[in-house]
């Protein structure tokens, strides 16, 4: 179970709504994912329509909607978008995104922190998308963010956990949930994040652009469940599991030592 603010989730796979070829396919894939937290860009929602093509089907799912401030280039724009979402959708949850760089969509750390401080004071449950910067994530936690969402790699890149070392530091020191967001392009990436100790992952592009989004959504669901189970079971020491540095050994260890067996053979030879 994962608790963020006042809500408990049984699924650690959060999903997005962009890039699907149709609202119907989006809805089917989201159902297959088992996701209970779904993010949506306010800039893509027709707030004047009571039957918006994106919003209406999402409300059928009975999940928590997480409006995001994608498109905001400054703290002020993000704050305005968050307030608009609260009024339009009757939610105080917001995924805070401030990325003025239109090419790489990298989050602006200064503007993100500024906006987070204001929104937290206004009673929002703030989940900020941010760079994999341990210092920034700690500052966001200190101003009251309910979780932090550091990137694995640039949005939509499908490159996986290119920031792994920094993610590990963030996970180790964080007192709020860590949700790896952006760049997760395969179920194996999601599994890796959960094994590393992340509390959840957010996936959009890898599901939406797959040949079969529904099957891919289900694959991510299984990967996240497997990653969490593996972490809870206790991963053995290896260079890929730095959570056990004291037991790390860069040499082979036989699972079935031959010492006793060879000794018996030597004794038989002498008989």
Curated annotation (Swiss-Prot):
Keywords: Cytoplasm, Schiff base, Thiamine biosynthesis, Transferase. 1-deoxy-D-xylulose 5-phosphate binds at residues 156, 182-183, 204-205. InterPro entries: Aldolase_TIM, Thiazole_synthase_ThiG, ThiG. The keyword Transferase applies. It is found in: Cytoplasm. Its main location: cytoplasm. Belongs to the ThiG family. This is Thiazole synthase. It comes from Yersinia pestis. The lineage of its organism: Bacteria, Pseudomonadati, Pseudomonadota, Gammaproteobacteria, Enterobacterales. The gene is thiG.
């Amino acid at each position: 179970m994962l608790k963020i603010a006042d809500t408990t989730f049984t699924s650690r796979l959060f999903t997005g709504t962009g890039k699907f070829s149709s609202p119907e396919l989006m809805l089917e894939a989201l159902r297959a994912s088992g996701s209970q937290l779904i993010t949506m860009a306010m800039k893509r929602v027709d707030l004047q329509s009571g039957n918006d093509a994106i919003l209406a089907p999402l409300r059928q799912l009975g999940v928590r909607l997480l409006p995001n401030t994608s498109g905001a280039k400054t703290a002020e724009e993000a704050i305005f978008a968050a307030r608009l979402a609260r009024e339009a959708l009757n939610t105080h949850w917001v995924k805070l995104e401030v990325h003025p760089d239109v090419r790489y969509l990298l989050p602006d750390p200064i503007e993100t922190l500024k906006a987070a401080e204001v929104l937290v004071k206004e009673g929002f449950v703030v989940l900020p998308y941010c760079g994999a910067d341990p210092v920034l994530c700690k500052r966001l936690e200190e101003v009251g963010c309910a979780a932090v969402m550091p990137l694995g790699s640039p949005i939509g890149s499908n490159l996986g956990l290119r920031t792994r070392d920094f993610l590990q530091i963030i996970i180790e020191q964080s007192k709020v949930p860590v949700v790896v967001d952006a760049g997760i392009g395969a179920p194996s990436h999601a599994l890796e994040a959960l094994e590393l100790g992340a509390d959840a992952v957010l996936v959009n592009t890898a599901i939406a652009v797959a040949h079969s989004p529904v099957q891919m959504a289900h694959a991510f669901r299984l990967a996240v469940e497997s990653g969490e189970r593996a972490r809870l079971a206790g991963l053995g020491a290896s260079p890929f599991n730095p959570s056990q540095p004291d037991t790390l050994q860069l040499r082979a260890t036989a699972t079935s030592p031959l010492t006793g067996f060879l000794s018996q053979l030597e004794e038989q030879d002498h008989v």
